Amino acid sequence: MNIFRDFEKKLEGLFEGVILRAFKRGVHPVEIGKKLARECEGNKTIGVSRVYVPNRYEVGLSPRDHSRFESYQAVLATELENLLITYVKEHGYAVLDRPRVKLVEVGRLREGEFWIKSRMEGELPQPHEPVETDDGILRPRDTGGPAVLEIMDSGEG
């Protein structure tokens, strides 16, 4: 599966690069949002009872694109983080804490080019040995281990 995903990413990069250079200038936030969702989807980790997705995202931008976003970078990052939260909710995924997006300048990128790197920061909850109680029933041990943020839909629109 990874071979196909890598191949798809290479084709996507070639295609997007040609199209971007031919028809437009600069990166638009909507493009970053779409690519963040793909990055999230492509880097799932299947846990014992949940599917985890990355919670840290770094967006590499050309110097020119980075400077265009500079005056509202914090607002844009928050908007992209909220987009990821919505995506996580809609797909029933779990994250170790609130997703964070950081925009960084990468000198070797040309205007309109960008990349995204993601990772999981924190620890996945570990399964624990059950404890036998006085009544002979095995119950999960309360370990006070790492917290997991599971985003649930409240049903409010």
Per-segment meaning from a language model:
Residues 15-19, 30-42, 78, 82, ...:
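Intrinsically disordered, low-complexity acidic Ser/Thr-rich regulatory segments
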Residues 24, 45-51, 64-76, 87-96:
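Short acidic, glycine/proline-enriched loop segments that cap or flank alpha-helices
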